[in-house]
Amino acid sequence: MANSAQARKRARQAAKANSHNSALRSKYRTAVKAVRKAIEAGDAAQAAEIFKASAKTLDIIADKKIVHKNKAARHKSRLAAAVKGLQAPAAQ
């Protein structure tokens, strides 16, 4: 256990940050899952709309350094490709 006032304060701050960061990581995963679910449903318009909102969420969380920016970019790229793949067959 923390013995100094400074160590107690840092422990409190770490617990608070951990709670906040956990919530944001959960929001990140939920956003990715929502897009994947829309893609599996096969509705291109809905998937594109959900992807647009989710991409913004991924960027915000990456900017806060909750997840690495490259991880967020990788997820966005793969989800965008999947959404585009839904729209391509309909156009032909």
Curated annotation (Swiss-Prot):
PANTHER family documented for this protein: 30S RIBOSOMAL PROTEIN S20, SMALL RIBOSOMAL SUBUNIT PROTEIN BS20C
NCBIfam families on file: S20
Record-linked Gene3D superfamilies: Ribosomal protein S20 (1.20.58.110)
Family from the record: Belongs to the bacterial ribosomal protein bS20 family.
UniProt-recorded name of the protein: Small ribosomal subunit protein bS20
GO terms, molecular function: small ribosomal subunit rRNA binding; structural constituent of ribosome
Any single biological process term in GO: translation
Keyword Repressor carried by entry: no
Gene Ontology CC: cytosol; small ribosomal subunit
Its biological purpose: Binds directly to 16S ribosomal RNA.
Region annotation Disordered: where it falls in the sequence: 1-25
One Pfam family in the UniProt entry: Ribosomal_S20p
UniProt keywords, alphabetically: Ribonucleoprotein, Ribosomal protein, RNA-binding, rRNA-binding
